[in-house]
A protein has these predicted regions:
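Bacterial Sec-dependent N-terminal signal peptides
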Residues: 2-8, 14-45
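First exposed extracellular module after export/assembly in secreted or surface-exposed proteins
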Residues: 34-251
């Protein structure tokens, strides 16, 4: 039930953020899909596949329905139907896309000096990470995916994930609403995916932050090729309860 709720929350947030939703439904009387999930699009030379946040690779026979004028989105939410003879127990998950659309996707901010606003959020709900190396896609970026609540009105909203500090292999980042209505009072749920840059890029940002403050720079040092991500945020009455750290393999 919770997975279903999260998925519909994502679909709602995609609409709020102005993203398109593609529909291939055949009819209300038909059981049109078998599962719904969030995934990373892997545009391989041979074929396009989807790496689900469940860690499973899915092979759609109609991936082109997700393609826009500028190519495939990085991250998508999709309803999938298994191909004939394929089940959840099958080794190769061949599917068709029943409905789908792009997710709100950004990179962890590499230019924090350009961010001027930090509008208060309502709550941090959940964080997950996706590491494509577990299924041998070493060139695919890792992502940090966050469920949260924010104050929303009819105006556009932009959410950023901004590096704050590092201690050993733990990176603290702040989830900030950087564009929005500072007078909004309606609480709404949101979901955002953030591409995790390379460790060298992150350390460059941390160095610039320290230099601006006149402090000694701290560096992120992976352990076994992995880092831990800790997400913090600010609400109307101060710091929100941070989410549990998540470990992910990075470049």
């Amino acid at each position: 039930f919770m997975k279903q709720m999260k998925f519909f929350l994502v679909a709602l947030m995609a609409v709020v953020m102005g993203m398109s939703v593609t529909s291939c439904m055949k009819g209300e009387s038909e059981s049109s899909y078998d599962l719904g999930l969030n995934a990373t699009v892997i545009d391989d030379v041979m074929q396009v596949c989807l790496l689900g946040d469940d860690g499973v690779v899915y092979y759609p026979n109609n991936a082109s329905v997700l393609k826009g004028t500028s190519g495939y989105p990085e991250r998508v939410f999709v309803f999938l139907k298994y191909a004939e003879g394929v089940t959840s127990a099958s080794t190769k998950k061949e599917v068709s896309i029943v409905q789908g659309g792009g997710l709100y996707t950004r990179s962890i901010c590499l230019k924090p000096d350009t961010i001027k606003n930090d509008l208060p959020l309502v709550a941090l709900t959940e964080v997950g990470v996706l590491d494509a190396t577990t299924v041998n896609y070493t060139s695919v970026s890792a992502y940090c995916n966050v469920i949260f609540s924010l104050y929303l009105s009819n105006s556009a909203a932009i959410i950023d994930l901004v590096p704050v500090s590092a201690a050993g292999n733990e990176l603290t980042v702040k989830l900030q609403q950087t564009i929005g209505d500072d007078k909004a009072s309606n609480a709404s749920s949101g979901y955002a995916s953030f591409k995790i840059p390379s460790v060298s890029q992150i350390n460059s940002v941390l160095a610039s932050i320290a230099a601006e403050k006149g402090e000694e720079a701290t560096s992120l040092i992976p352990s076994g090729g992995k880092i831990k991500i800790k997400i913090v945020a600010t609400g109307k009455n101060g710091a929100l309860t941070p989410l549990n750290t998540k470990e992910v393999k990075v470049n």
